[in-house]
A protein has these predicted regions:
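Active-site loop/helix belt of alpha/beta enzymes
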Residues: 1-121
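C-terminal accessory subdomain/extension
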Residues: 119-218
Length: 218
């Protein structure tokens, strides 16, 4: 990036290179979720003045853009030639304020199919470090082929749920590089059918009335 005070010198410098063409000028907001704040307004002012200085000097700016999801929803003055919606494309609100302006519906879901089922004995450990041990009999452990190499944070180990047949079932053991395990535990008051190889489970999304959102995962 180029500091706003050096933009014009930078553009003048590259103008002497025949192999370089300016296709666009942009910035990325640090505090777009606070459009009434001083920092946001100052960054808007600096960017606008830098763009105008380039134009006044006779140079082409190309496509001017800076509005991310919150800025595109909350401040139309910063739309310029295009907007850069990121998290909003997934139907997720970037901040509380944007939720008052526009309703967004989540459109992304993550599914996986069971690759292994097991019925370990009571007291047996599951996963690296045995951070989960089977507490009793009639616990089914299912393996799903997603891990931290796929973006599933290892910090969620033993803390997240997945959906199976409209029910929440607990992830157990440490999340591995390319797989993790869940435990299906039934009791007389609440019976959950055991899973089979190839059954689908939902990591993010909706199944009947049950839902796991990206906000929950975060």
């Amino acid at each position: 990036g180029v500091h706003y005070t050096q933009v014009l010198d930078f553009v003048r410098g590259i103008s002497f290179h025949r192999g370089i063409q300016c296709d666009g000028v942009f910035t990325h907001f640090a505090t777009a979720d606070e459009p009434s704040g001083w920092d946001y307004k100052l960054q808007c002012q600096r960017f606008t003045e830098a763009v105008q200085a380039i134009k006044d000097a006779g140079f082409e700016c190309g496509i001017v853009h800076c509005a991310n999801t919150p800025s595109s929803m909350l401040d139309s003055s910063m739309h310029f030639d295009m907007i850069r919606a990121g998290i909003g494309l997934y139907g997720l609100q970037p901040c509380e304020l944007s939720g008052r302006v526009m309703q967004l519906d989540p459109v992304m879901s993550v599914h996986a199919r069971v690759t292994r089922v097991a019925h370990p004995a009571m007291g047996e450990g599951v996963g690296y470090g045995f951070t989960y041990r089977v507490p009793r009999t009639r616990v089914q452990i299912c393996t799903l082929p997603i891990g931290y190499a796929d973006g599933l944070s290892r910090t969620l180990s033993n803390r997240m749920d997945v959906l199976y047949r409209g029910e929440r079932v607990r992830q157990v053991g440490n999340i591995c590089m390319d797989q993790f395990m869940v435990a299906i535990q039934s009791n007389p008051a609440h019976e959950i059918p055991e899973a089979e190889y190839g059954d689908e489970m939902i990591i993010v999304g909706r199944d009947g009335d049950a839902e796991i959102t990206m906000d929950e995962m975060a």
